[in-house]
């Protein structure tokens, strides 16, 4: 057989599929469960004063993201019906539990928007009592502990009246076009916020103990 015939014959033969990397095969056969931000992320050694926050909603966003409690992923709940946007980054404190069976909500004041699903260290400076459609839905007001412009704040009384009014009016108005009633009361100090976080930590611990006993 001539060299030209050999070349033509080899070209006609089907190419063999490359072998998959053994590491890929190994990882596919032994898949591990993905970490859940609510249960697997630690709250932090300095809680309830300084604690981790998982960001769900970016500052300036009109999209209402929220934690999908089953998968641990951040899902789109809805787009806000009004023209307002979230004034600051919004998320939750891991390993906490409130009476509504959700983790503790937090609004984090800082300079920049943060990508949903990331986490940061925050310091509680106050609490905003809120009733959402007849149910208690208080919000912790916090500052990013690693933002040089905000980390020196220790109590909500140190914020300007305009900033407080901005936060209050957002939560009062953001559901009006959905015909849902939200009532916001006067802001409470950092000591009250820390007590609320500690209570939610204790409630979460009780929930875990009950789950283990079942």
UniProtKB/Swiss-Prot annotation:
PANTHER family named among the record's database cross-references: INORGANIC PYROPHOSPHATASE
Cofactors, names only: Mg(2+)
Binding site for Mg(2+) 1: 100, 105, 137
InterPro entries the UniProt entry points to: Pyrophosphatase, Pyrophosphatase_sf
Organism encoding this protein: Zea mays
Protein name: Soluble inorganic pyrophosphatase
HAMAP family: Inorganic_PPase (MF_00209)
Region ranges (Disordered): 1-20
Catalytic activity as recorded in UniProt: diphosphate + H2O = 2 phosphate + H(+)
Record has Transmembrane as a keyword: no
Keyword tags: Cytoplasm, Hydrolase, Magnesium, Metal-binding
Assigned protein family: Belongs to the PPase family.
SUPFAM superfamilies hit by this protein: Inorganic pyrophosphatase
Subcellular localization: Cytoplasm
Any one GO molecular-function label of the UniProt entry: inorganic diphosphate phosphatase activity
The keyword Magnesium is annotated on this UniProt entry: yes
Source organism, top-level taxon: Eukaryota
GO CC annotations, alphabetized: cytosol
Enzyme Commission number(s) from the entry: 3.6.1.1
Pfam families in UniProt: Pyrophosphatase (PF00719)
């Amino acid at each position: 057989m001539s060299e030209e015939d050999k070349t033509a014959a080899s070209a006609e033969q089907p190419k063999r599929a490359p072998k998959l990397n053994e590491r890929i095969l190994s990882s596919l056969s032994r898949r591990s469960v993905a970490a859940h931000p609510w249960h697997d992320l630690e709250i932090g050694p300095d809680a309830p004063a300084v604690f981790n926050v998982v960001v769900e909603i970016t500052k300036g966003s009109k999209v209402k993201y929220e934690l999908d409690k089953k998968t641990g992923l951040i899902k789109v709940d809805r787009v806000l019906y009004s023209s307002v946007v979230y004034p600051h980054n919004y998320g939750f404190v891991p390993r906490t539990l409130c009476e509504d069976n959700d983790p503790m909500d937090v609004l984090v004041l800082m300079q920049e928007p943060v990508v949903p699903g990331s986490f940061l260290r925050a310091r509680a400076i106050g609490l905003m009592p809120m009733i959402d459609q007849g149910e208690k839905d208080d919000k912790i007001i916090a500052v990013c502990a690693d933002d040089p412009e905000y980390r020196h704040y220790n109590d909500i009384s140190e914020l300007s009246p305009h900033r407080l009014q901005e936060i209050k009016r957002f939560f009062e108005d953001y559901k009006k076009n959905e015909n849902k009633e939200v009532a916001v009361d006067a802001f409470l100090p950092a000591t009250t916020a820390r007590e609320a976080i500690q209570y939610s930590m204790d409630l979460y611990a009780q929930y875990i103990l009950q789950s283990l006993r079942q």
